[in-house]
């Protein structure tokens, strides 16, 4: 058994192979003390000088001490030198790495304990001899502990010692002390058998010598191949399977076949690892995790490797054989993969051909059924066979559409209707008169629309090269019959033609309906309008033009200009007493545009009405109202502004002049009141609500008020002044109520409005006067102007019992001597 574990030293081979070997080569300590005069010298004995290396050596003479040679005392027990606590290989390696920096700066001479055990002096040996000789087993060893207080154990516990565990930071010390076994006699070591204790057997189990020899033999077996001075290294074998070789070949092919793009030569810096790496392209970066290839050895490496054993020719041949074998494997793998791909491709093609063959067989079967149905159309053309009716043809087409829709669309079977259905439908419509029986044949044509017309051609135009079958049917069969009928039709006989077009409109394509209205009917209407004379024709033009409005709408606008021109020419010698003009023009009011209608009336009617009002004679004693009534009959035909303009220029000046003359000749104010109210009653509410008409009527009231106040005309009937004042007050109150009626209506609406909805004012005050009027209404205060009462040209108003006037948005209240400005709230408080 090796004792190197007691000395605490292990060599490199011990660390590598686990074998404990004591090295005897020249160490650093030997080199440092080679020229040291104080180092301990070893004297050669006579026997060593005589026999040399064959001299018998005594273990006691290896390292003599300075005390001289003394006799051996074999009665003393064996003393061992403690090597301290052994550390694990990882701890020793970490300790050596940590101490490399400090040792590199300064290397002090090794202490005495660092020298090899065989070169140490005998001081320690003497001490052990004295220690061994001074102690006698069997005596009262440690009796002095009985008289102490156990201070040592207490100190150890303070420093963290736990009884039953080893000393040290990690409790790496031994728990039980080293056991010593007393030798039976005075013989040498091993003379009395094994001297190992039970503790030694547990800590260092016995290893079979044969196993040690076998291990040593295996270790030294291959030493002849190694270079001298090199440590044993286990051979490293690299295995490459066929799958690895295929994968490597696939990646190589992919990298070679990858096209060089714009970013092929971009420099990429990879900082994802511990160290910064630079790649020449993104493809290199994508391969950073792939299995690296075995790089070729450098020249120095090959020389160093081949110094012990080198056969370059053999290595070249082996490498060449390996490469050829790899190429054969890759080529075979490629051929195998190609054959597999070919098999898969052929399998897919075979399956596709089988599917296509089945589809073709099914298509052939369907085509045979289609041919059998189409041949039924030809059966009716043969001699001796009855011709097919429209109903039978419709059933065949419906069967083709429902059961063979794909073939119907791809082969254009709908075009068969041109040769099959057209003759049958022409025969049915040959004797048809649209003006007598407009619904004849409508059901059959509607049935064929559902069969032949496609949704894509609903809004298509007339394209003779690619026309829908149904559109072609209508265009070639129905339109010629309709064209013949329209050419013989009288536009004034509007009813039958309008009924016919309205009846057939749902089944006609849009472009065909437009063609009938624009190309067939409109030219006939235009020709008839050109021949129309409003002075001689007894039938009004609107009676045969207006029925076309729902169908033609804006298409009739080109006819309106000639109609207005003819009507204007007919009104040149017209007088308002002739009411026929109003009957002719009234149906056209909603047909013409508002601008065109207003221009026509201003140019042709208003001047005639102005002349009629000019001829009106206002005579209070014998009044003729026919001219005035003739003008008022046109109120519904004219705009309010036109009527007010007529009255302002041609009626009110004459009417006010007659009133002034009457008031200056001792009038009867009761008759004047009735006369005023009579003329006012002839005006409509729309005219009375106009500001200009209100102004003229108020002017008449002012004239009457001034006449009563000044006593103009001499004698005045009793109560005339009060009657006139009452009339004025009543008229003003009516005007005031008319102004407030929209606001009251808004108040009523707000009362019935549900809570949470904000009231929207019907009219927003536009000036300060309107605001004062609104506040007066809110507080129930009467606010009205005073007749013929002014102050410095400003109208005076009564606000309750207070007289005020308004100037520049400020209310002035009449005081004792002057007019005082006040606020609106103060005015309301004073009025209450």
Curated annotation (Swiss-Prot):
GO biological process, one term: spliceosomal complex disassembly
SMART domains assigned: G_patch (SM00443)
Phosphoserine: residues bearing it: 209
UniProt region (Disordered), positions on chain: 1-21, 33-145
A Pfam family hit: GCFC
Chief location: nucleus
Domain G-patch per the UniProt entry, residue ranges: 148-194
Keywords: mRNA processing, mRNA splicing, Nucleus, Phosphoprotein, Spliceosome
GO cellular component: spliceosomal complex; U2-type post-mRNA release spliceosomal complex
Bias type Basic and acidic residues, positions: 36-49, 88-99
InterPro entries tied to this protein: G_patch_dom, GCFC_dom, STIP/TFIP11_N, TFP11, TFP11/STIP/Ntr1
GO molecular function, one term: nucleic acid binding
Subcellular location: Nucleus
Biased composition (Polar residues): 121-130
Similarity section: Belongs to the TFP11/STIP family.
Cited function: Involved in pre-mRNA splicing, specifically in spliceosome disassembly during late-stage splicing events.
Subunit details: Identified in the spliceosome C complex.
Protein's name according to its UniProt entry: Tuftelin-interacting protein 11
Gene source species: Danio rerio
Gene that specifies this protein: tfip11
């Amino acid at each position: 058994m090796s004792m190197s574990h007691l000395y605490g030293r292990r060599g490199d081979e011990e660390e590598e192979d686990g074998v404990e070997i004591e090295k005897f080569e020249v160490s650093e300590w030997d080199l440092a003390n080679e020229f040291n005069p104080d180092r301990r010298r070893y004297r050669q004995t006579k026997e060593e000088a005589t026999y040399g290396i064959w001299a018998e050596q005594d273990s006691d003479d290896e390292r003599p001490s300075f005390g001289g040679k003394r006799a051996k005392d074999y009665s003393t027990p064996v003393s061992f030198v403690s090597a301290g606590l052994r550390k694990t290989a990882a701890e020793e390696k970490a300790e050596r790495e940590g101490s490399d920096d400090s040792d590199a700066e300064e290397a002090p001479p090794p202490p005495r304990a660092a020298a090899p055990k065989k070169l140490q002096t005998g001081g320690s040996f003497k001490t052990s001899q004295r220690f061994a000789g001074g102690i006698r087993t069997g005596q009262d060893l440690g009796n002095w502990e009985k008289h102490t207080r156990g201070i040592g154990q207490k100190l150890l516990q303070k420093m963290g010692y736990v009884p039953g565990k080893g000393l040290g930071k990690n409790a790496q010390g031994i728990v039980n002390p080293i056991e010593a076994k007393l030798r039976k006699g005075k013989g040498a070591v091993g003379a009395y058998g094994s001297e190992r204790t039970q503790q030694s057997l547990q800590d260092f189990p016995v290893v079979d010598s044969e196993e040690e020899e076998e291990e040593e033999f295996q270790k030294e077996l291959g030493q002849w191949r190694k270079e001298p001075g090199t440590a044993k290294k286990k051979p490293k074998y690299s295995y490459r399977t066929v799958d690895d070789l295929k994968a490597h070949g696939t990646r190589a092919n992919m990298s070679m076949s990858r096209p060089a793009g714009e970013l092929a030569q971009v420099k990429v810096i990879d900082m994802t690892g511990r160290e910064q790496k630079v790649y020449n392209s993104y493809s290199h970066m994508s391969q950073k995790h792939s299995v690296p290839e075995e790089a070729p050895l450098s020249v120095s490496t090959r020389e160093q490797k081949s110094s012990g054993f080198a056969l370059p020719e053999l290595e070249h041949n082996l490498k060449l054989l390996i490469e050829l074998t790899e190429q054969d494997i890759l080529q075979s793998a490629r051929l195998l993969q190609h054959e597999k791909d070919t098999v898969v491709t052929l399998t897919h093609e075979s399956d596709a051909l089988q599917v296509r063959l089945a589809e073709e067989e099914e298509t052939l079967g369907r085509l045979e059924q289609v041919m059998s149905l189409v041949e039924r159309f030809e059966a009716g053309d043969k001699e001796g066979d009855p011709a097919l009716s429209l109903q039978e043809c419709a059933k065949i087409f419906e069967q083709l559409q429902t059961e063979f829709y794909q073939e119907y669309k791809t082969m254009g079977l709908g075009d068969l209707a041109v040769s099959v259905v057209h003759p049958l439908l022409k025969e049915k419509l040959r004797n048809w008169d649209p003006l007598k029986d407009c619904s004849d044949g409508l059901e059959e044509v509607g049935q064929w629309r559902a069969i032949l017309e496609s949704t894509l051609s609903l809004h298509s135009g007339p394209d003779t090269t690619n026309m829908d079958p149904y559109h072609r049917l209508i265009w070639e069969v129905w339109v010629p019959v309709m064209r013949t009928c329209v050419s013989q039709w009288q536009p004034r006989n509007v009813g039958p033609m309008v009924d016919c077009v309205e009846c057939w409109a749902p089944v006609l394509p849009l472009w065909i309906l437009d063609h009938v209205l624009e190309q067939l009917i409109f030219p006939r209407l235009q020709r008839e309008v050109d021949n129309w004379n409003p002075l001689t024709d007894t039938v009004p033009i609107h009676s045969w033009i207006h029925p076309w409005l729902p169908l033609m709408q804006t298409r009739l606008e080109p006819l309106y200009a000639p109609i207005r021109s003819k009507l204007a020419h007919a009104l040149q010698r017209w007088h308002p007493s002739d009411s026929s003009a109003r009957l002719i023009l009234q149906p056209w009011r909603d047909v013409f545009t508002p601008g065109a209608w207003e221009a026509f009336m201003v140019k042709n009617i208003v001047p005639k009405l102005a002349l009629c009002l000019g001829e009106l004679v206002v005579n209070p004693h014998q009044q003729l109202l026919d001219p005035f009534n003739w003008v008022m009959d046109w109120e519904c035909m004219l705009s309010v502004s036109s009527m007010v303009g007529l009255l302002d220029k041609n009626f009110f000046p004459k009417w006010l002049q007659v009133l002034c003359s009457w008031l200056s000749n001792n009038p009867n104010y009761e008759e004047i009141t009735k006369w005023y109210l009579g003329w006012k009653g002839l005006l409509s509410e729309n005219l009375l609500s106009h500001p200009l008409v209100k102004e003229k009527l108020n002017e008449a009231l002012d004239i009457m008020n001034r006449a009563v106040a000044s006593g103009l005309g001499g004698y005045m009937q009793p109560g005339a002044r009060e009657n006139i004042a009452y009339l004025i007050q009543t008229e003003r109150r009516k005007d005031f109520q008319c102004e407030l009626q929209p606001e009251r209506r808004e108040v009523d609406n707000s009362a019935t409005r549900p809570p949470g909805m904000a009231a929207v004012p019907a009219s927003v005050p536009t000036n300060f006067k309107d605001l004062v009027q609104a506040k007066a209404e809110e507080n129930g205060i009467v606010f009205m102007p005073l007749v013929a009462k002014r102050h410095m040209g400003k109208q005076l108003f009564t606000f309750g019992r207070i007289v005020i006037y308004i100037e520049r948005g400020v209310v002035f209240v009449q005081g004792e001597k002057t007019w005082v400005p006040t606020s609106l709230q103060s005015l309301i408080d004073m009025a209450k």
